[in-house]
Amino acid sequence: MRFLRLGLEDAVPDAKTIWLYREHLTRAGVIRDLFADFDGWLKGKGYLAMSGQIVDASIIAAPRQRNSDAEKAALKEGRIPEDWRAKPAKLAQKDRDARWTLKRAKARKSKADGTKARVEIAIPVFGYKNHIGIDKAHRLIRGFSVTSGAAYDGAQLPAVMARNTASDVWAETAYRTRANEAFLDARGLRSRIHFRRRPGQDLTRPQKKANRARSKIRSAVEGVFAHQKQAFGLVVRTIGMARATTKIALANLAYNVRRYIWLAEHQPAA
């Protein structure tokens, strides 16, 4: 209410009003312009993109689709199932853009000797991905893209890059590709992307040491995603890529607003 300058005596927008506002943003196709305008305002306040940038992606869950095997096969082929065509109301409730992916996580498994070992597990998740680039100095989101949950993270690096006063770029191993290295080199940027282990080979000692140092910096981006999911409760309950993009973009914008409020109090711009 304070953000909207509403008093206790004022009417608070209901859920339908907020939904319609978001829908108007989607149909007008201006959400990226809105995000860019606020980024320009931040720079005008002295919060320039500084010290390099960190790139990463996070899965944003969406309601699971209960589709038959035939419907799944049709969707994979890019077709609309015949049963959906005959039922427009059903078609309107089906998200044909969200996709399944596997989320990697760590778990502790009990061993025979009573100790616990860390094992890697894969958790199926249905939804979209929020790809972002933040600046290292202020941890503000400077660029973003939204894809289906199955999209390859590394392919989105060019889409989330922004102008920065420094040339360093940090990212995990998924972003270490020849195409990305060539892209960074062409723009005069310095790759701090984690080294990838070659098949059948282990990383060298210097590479392991470099990855540990890079992880300490790269981990800052995890705090952005954690804030969106814990403080905002970010999930996608809309249908389709266009609406999902608006929903996620607004979450990125809202994060920057809250981050600016914190920065203004604790780290005033010079």
What are these model-predicted stretches?
Residues S58-I59, H194, G200-Q201:
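Short secondary-structure capping/turn micro-motifs that flank functional sites
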Residues R178, A182, A186-R187, Q207-A270:
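Basic, amphipathic alpha-helical segments enriched in Lys/Arg and hydrophobic/aromatic residues
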Residues H131-G133, G143-S145, W170, R192, ...:
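Structured core elements
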Residues R187-F195:
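Short hydrophobic/aromatic-enriched beta-strand-loop microsegments
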Residues A155, A179, G200-Q207:
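Short, charged, surface-exposed secondary-structure boundary motifs
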Residues L4-A186:
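Polybasic low-complexity intrinsically disordered regions
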Residues T173, F195-R196, G223:
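Short secondary-structure boundary segments
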